[in-house]
Amino acid sequence: MLARALMLALIVAVPLACGDEPGFDPAAPRCLHLPRPPSRDVLQLERVLPDIAIEGGVALLQAPDDATRWYLVTQPGVVHRFGVDGGAAEVVLDLSTKVALAAEAGLLGMAFHPDFASNGEVFVSYTAPGGKVFTSRISRFRSSDGGRTIDPASEEVLLELEQPYSNHNGGDLAFGPDGYLYFGFGDGGSSGDPQGNAQNPETLLGKLIRIDVDGGDPYAIPADNPFAAGGGRPEIFALGLRNPWRFSFDRETGALWAGDVGQNLWEEVNLIERGKNYGWDFKEGPDCFEADTCDETDLVPPVAYYRNISSASVIAGHVYRGTQLPAIAGLFIYTDFYRGTIWGVKPGSEPVVLADAGARGLVGFGEAADGELYALDYQGGIYHLRAASPPEGPGLPDLLSGTGCVAVADPQGPPAHAIAYDLNLDFWSDGASKRRWMVVPDGDSITVDPDGDWQLPAGSALVKTFYRDERPLETRLFVRHDDGAWAGYTYAWDAGGAEATLLGAGETRTIDGQPWIFPDRGDCLYCHSEAAGFSLGLETSQLLRTIPGPDGQPRDQLDALVELGLLRARPTAEPLPAADSDAPLADRARAYLHVNCSSCHRPDGPDGRANMDLRFSTALVDAGVCDQAPRAGDLGLVDARLLRPGDPALSLIHI
């Protein structure tokens, strides 16, 4: 590291030479091999049943009176069964030829009749071809062998509802303690509920419904349903919901908990009560869209809500009633598909963070017969919620100056052993400017993937400080720990710019009259995903540029990094055009989308709501945007497209 820093001073004229920095201490922290902070987690996810890795799972459940087997419901239309201790997975129901499969469509839910052991009845929800887009369907099936198989020919369709758009289909269903079947419908999709469905009692869209599957043909209406005597659809139990993807009943109290997926502001956790209104489409979380016309008189506020800055889909779980985790007894457990933080909450109390599971793509929770909880991810992983191990080690320093990642004399600047770098095109960050540097263990080098993403060795750190009007706001450390895993940490600067303090959780502060969002640790890996190469800005096309040399003459940045030994060979690529360059406007626009959007919108990226590939290297004809109809809402625009050439007013990317 000493030799590399001295060479750096000669090559790129870093102001501080190693050993000349005031207060330099060779034994001081060097921003290398940084430790993780002591875990704040109460829970950990323990992978179980590793041989059961069936992708596309959306629900995990057990049949009544059978604690020995799990049933896994998959979005493509297949239900599998396997033992709680492992063994081969068996297909018990295959509806793959019947379902209409899309981003939020397919086989979405399943529930066993409470008397399944005697009547063999199973209920499923799925989207079927038909209608403008497709039709949501609730059907009854039967098993004659105790659940080893479910007869596809026994289907009895109970209810169908045409969907006007492809998203917000809800899909969960469950039997309540009253013996009735409950089902959640989204508002019909698009954005902002353009048809006003959630508040319209004459449609089932945007509602939680309740029906009696034992008392009629094909069902009866419970006498105490809110509109059983008229005034709306008699199936309605509660209204004002956007997309209740998952809900569950507390096995001890019978309370009905639901997660309502938000739009642009808030994700909600609600206690659903008969006849109550939950506010969508004029209120989301604590916020009314039009304060002057927002009548909150009869609304039920959410029990919990959180900003969907780097989150996008609340995943409701269950109230924990097991015995292995007394610390979370009675808490309702929930997470987010994109973020992975696991929270717990009780009515009247603030939510608590129980675990940071990372961006695993958790889609649901399964409750075992003994009350223990399991989490399911979309890639096929099944996890048992266990007590977290006690924290070990001193952890990351609370003060940025103690990390070795900044200069002792000037904590806003890089230390002598760091390597500053610059990019062709900055990510937009609310108008903030940035300074960047990296620290790589001496003797190690950076590898370059075939697509140009750079991979730093374990023990490295990336440092980025955000400024507004030359005032430091935040420094982020993106660390590759010694086990090879990446993690992000945020330090918030004091008003005088003298020191920055480690934040334990995300928060929003108003600075000089403007909000600034400090990300939670779980937020970082939403954009800094494996699909995007983790480091984002460190890619050949971004770093292929000139920098000032020690003599004031321009110097090729990649050549300098090769001479430092950080790169074993000079990679080749076309530089990403800067916004103020003389490159063609189309190229500059594609570069903007690459930097600001492609970390999610790419193959295997975290956003599955739009099938776009916005990487600069992808030909526009293959990007999936030109004249493509939106899959997740059209913002109320007639004949909108993701990108309509020559018509920005109907191009959702522009809007």
Where are the model-predicted features located?
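A detector of repeated loop/turn-to-beta-strand junctions in beta-rich toroidal repeat architectures
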Residues: 135, 198, 202-205, 266, ...
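Flexible internal linker/loop segments at domain or repeat junctions
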Residues: 277-311, 572-573, 619-637
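Beta-propeller blade signature
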Residues: 137-146, 201-213
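Bacterial N-terminal signal peptides
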Residues: 5-15
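Surface-exposed loop and turn segments in beta-propeller and other repeat-based domains
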Residues: 90-103, 154-165, 215-237, 282-309
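Acidic, Gly/Ser/Thr-rich repeat motifs that build Ca2+-stabilized beta-propeller blades
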Residues: 18-192, 246-262, 310-350, 371-372, ...
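N-terminal pre-domain segments of enzymes
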Residues: 20-39, 389-435
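Sequence context surrounding c-type heme c attachment/ligation sites in exported
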Residues: 351, 359-361, 391, 400-401, ...
